[in-house]
């Protein structure tokens, strides 16, 4: 996709020997030659065809899917990957291919369970690229389409294949796992097989510290429901030579080093030592690895072995064999006694030989002979041949490799047997972890087989990529022609052709004993000298070069023949088959061909070829998914991206070939809305004119077609949803677009300069006008100041004159008032003196009459009480006589009866005494009150007469005053009359004072008597209560007596009938007139006592059964009533109140054993089975929480039962209540509290009640969680649509949203309105069922927290959501939620709005303008103080402005964030950028207690259905 036409100023990519590709700007164009000034500063001259266009509008953070790149070529792909790698985005799509770049550091936040939950059910490409997305897509396709799937993970060593495979298996195990109750053994074994296989099959190489030295294909089998039903692991080509040969700085397999770091007892048992002392390990200086503890890995491997089904005995045997291999490697050989013979070199070798024989559990001499000798069997005899030192060492290494290879195969088979394969499985998902293409300085047989595998897989990959392209074209219904792509079948024929292929020649050479690698190489040179993919290096006689799809690789043939031979030395087979260790013997079983002494030739290459055929057959029956792992640098360090290295891996991984296939067709594919948004400036007239300039009537495809016809572009295709462009056409459109935008920029500049000039002129004109206005204003202000002073002078003169006149008038006024005041005061004092004298006389008379009335009242009251007491005593004695007559027939209850009678007599006597005293007091009080009333009436009459006389005198005085014109002083002549009146007045005063004293004394006595009366009244009430209780007890005893008597009669009749049946028919001597005498009774005394005891036991049992049956009936009636919705009363659930009252009355809280609690728990559990009915759940949440509150109040710690004072219904009780005064407000509140206390009473609870309280608490929490989860599930579908703004027909995001009520009528906010309506619906449901506000608050707080988590995580996982227009859209939706919180009030919403703090701050950052001017401190402390640096970094790197095309934050801010993230990289928690959902229960029973009040239940009524039931009369 090289440039076809370029202009000066165009940005292009040019090749660079150091960084592969470098960008620059075209500064000169001369025909087909151009000059480009690179960003590095140098200027290069190249051909136009060598340059590639650069997309200057590409996001700085790259794109998730590289098929969305405007220019799909090598530099564009490389730049996109580097941009994403710089912001820690290590995963990128290329269509359906996932490219994974190894970050060489741990990023735990990308792989935790929360991240896994995000990808479950999400569409492929909906969230950021991730292995979880590939695994989820494979799983969904398997379930929906019923087709088995495969995921192929490839890449060179160190690219991260093993870790990626682990993630895939972890996700699939979680998706297809069983419930915890069903057991998850299969999934656990599949996951734990990884560390076991890594321990025995992985090693450190030059490129990777944990390189898999074998290929692995894991088949995970599923049943019809999509659950894992079995699994199998297939392995390919274990690198056996590594056991004996290790290059520096590589390591041998991990298990050897783990074993040397085992616990001391294991080291002692297997005679191990430091790894540096073993020959197979000390060939390399690398013994220990950073961040890897071999001792810890040993323990983890043993635990994993336990999980996968390898028992402890087998584990001991495995590590014993591994230890034997280490000791075997330390056996060195020297010259033997005979010529060309060998023997252990020294004592150390003998020690290790002996130790190896002990660990193999075989004969030491036999082991030595098998290493140093060979037995040749001929027809007539057996010949023993000695081996020289070199041959003996090769024999030793061959034994070590064979034993380790057999051990590894045994472990794989054991894992497969333990996991278990499901022959009836419907589908499977295979995960292939295969070695990538390898090309080293020295390439041997292993690299040859690995590259053959990659050739096979590349052919499969190319076919799949071509199929994807074909499916894409068919899906869009466009016309397309056949796409040519490179088929590597010729290379495969060169290698694996049956007759004449390299493998065929290799097998043929291995069958000849005298064949060498030279003869093998010569044979290949002759056979393939004309093959275009085969060549011979000039400076070598035994090497050969194959032109693979990823490049030329030169192989060295020195070890080809030895490594290809797949045989076991007969002596080794015989020796280890005879081992005393059953495990070792099982590794070397006898084979059928060994018995016949004939064996068909077998080679590693043939077997590997057959395995590849089987693998490809399996893959051909599955739908493939590809993950290409890339290693960014060879230093294995983070934050380093080597362009050349990555580009080579992309070529080797087939990614560039896939891009080339895509480029051969239509490499550029743009959705209609994106295409129009970018190129509508080329032909704006093809769009219908509307309010915003975008088409309304025409469709997008028609608009795109008109635009392309307008620009006269050829070869394009219009699909159903996309525009398909040929290679180079995108660059052509961009060039034309740049021209249009350039002309538009010129016009904008012209308009802007005109605007600046006009603005300057208007400013000057405005300044001149302002100066004139200031001058004119100053003159006007001076004139106005003179006028204001003249007016002020006149105002001051008027005020002074007014003040003098007012002062003169006030002096005259106060003099007149003073004179009148003196005259009126003297007259008033005279009247006051006369009124005081009259009042004193009246008071004396009233007190006298009051005293007489009280005496008369007390006498009457005393007589009435005496009469009542005598009558009640008579009734009590009559009742007592009845009770005595009723109790005479039963002797068992005489003691209780006599005791009760005594108590009744004593209490009756006390009651009579109290009543007499009370009657006397009432009579005297009544008499006194009557006397006082009569005296009061007389005094009132006198007062009226006196008042009339006084009024007459006053009127006469007024008339005299009117007749006398002048007031004159009249001397008093009648002094005697004055003295007489004065003396009488003094006598009256003394009489009044004495009466006052008597009255005070009488009042004190009355108060004392009142107190005594109240105390006695209380005692009388208590006595009456006791009498009522005793009467009730006597009544119950009478009922029991009647029952017992009836049962006795029945039993007597039965016994008499039985006795008559056994007696002889002859008459009995002792009978007289049908009766027996006491001495001659038919039954003796012991029989009568036994019969009586039996009768008592039977009656007790019947009584208990009767009570139990009654109790069951009552409990059943209660449950049948409350199981239905019986509504609410006083805002509280009737069912909870009724249950509590019944439990309290039945004393269930104090019972040691009762079934009522179990039945209530079962009833509640069955009532809430319908988890989706919020109305029903809310009703039971209200009932259970209310019942829990009432029980919580009753079962408070340290609570003691209180006796409830019974309400007296007797005549005396009603009279006593009538004498009490009306209650005040304080008494009213106290009465309410007392009534509430009567409803909820503290009790001493037993274990069943405490257990019921715990179960009830659990049900409250469960129902709360069910309602909360229902609301979350309802909102989750809407939240996925609320995070991204809907687009118009041309793809432009809706930008302007209004707040308040108009938003709910706006169609773009339909999904937000759905959330708004859903919240209102659940709120009304909870309110209608009177759920406590504290629970409603917590439901909405957790729901808003869930909304915050979902929206915020979606924002960070989907780049298309981090836009300016989308921020405005989400902000408008959040305004709706804020409006809901304000309307709901804090009582129900609580702090719900604060739970949206993360998404609010993130959206606030997205919609703020001029982000490039904001510093990091402003962002972290002012704009987004709650967000972490990882979250800020992700938002800043993903953000792009789709409305105004402005920049994000500056590069300095990004650099600061990177530094802070690097400092926190060791902290796993701090590196996570996603939020975790909180599903805990945020309240306790104490919270309910604090939110509800006891007095709310004071006036509640029980269920109406139970009021008609006599057994529940206590509820009324």
Swiss-Prot record:
Composition bias of kind Polar residues appears in 1069-1084
Q: Where is the Dilute domain?
A: 1158-1463
**Matching CDD domains, A to Z?**
IQCD (cd23767), MyosinXI_CBD (cd15475), MYSc_Myo11 (cd01384)
Phosphoprotein listed as a keyword: no
Q: Does the keyword Repeat apply?
A: yes
Binding-site list for ATP:
155-162, 208-216
Q: Which family does it belong to?
A: Belongs to the TRAFAC class myosin-kinesin ATPase superfamily. Myosin family. Plant myosin class XI subfamily.
Molecular function per GO = actin binding; ATP binding; calmodulin binding; cytoskeletal motor activity
User: Which UniProt keywords are given for this protein, alphabetically ordered?
Assistant: Actin-binding, ATP-binding, Calmodulin-binding, Coiled coil, Motor protein, Myosin, Nucleotide-binding, Repeat
Q: What role does it play?
A: Myosin heavy chain that is required for the cell cycle-regulated transport of various organelles and proteins for their segregation. Functions by binding with its tail domain to receptor proteins on organelles and exerting force with its N-terminal motor domain against actin filaments, thereby transporting its cargo along polarized actin cables.
Give me the disulphide-bonded residues. none
Q: Which stretches of sequence are listed as region Actin-binding?
A: 494-528, 530-553, 588-612, 612-634
Q: Where is the Myosin motor domain?
A: 61-738
Q: Name one GO cellular component term.
A: myosin complex
Gene Ontology BP, a term: actin filament-based movement
Per the record, which residues fall in region Disordered?
Answer: 1061-1085
- Which residues are in the Myosin N-terminal SH3-like domain? 7-56
Residue span, IQ domain: 741-770, 764-793, 789-818, 812-841, 837-866, 860-889
Q: How does it assemble?
A: Homodimer.
Q: What is known of its domains?
A: IQ domain mediates interaction with calmodulin.
In terms of InterPro entries, this protein maps to: Dilute_dom, IQ_motif_EF-hand-BS, Kinesin_motor_dom_sf, Myosin_head_motor_dom-like, Myosin_N, MyosinXI_CBD, MYSc_Myo11, P-loop_NTPase
Q: Which residues form a coiled coil?
A: 890-1056
Q: Which organism is it from?
A: Arabidopsis thaliana
Q: What is this protein called?
A: Myosin-14
Q: Pfam families recorded for this chain? A: DIL (PF01843), IQ (PF00612), Myosin_head (PF00063), Myosin_N (PF02736)
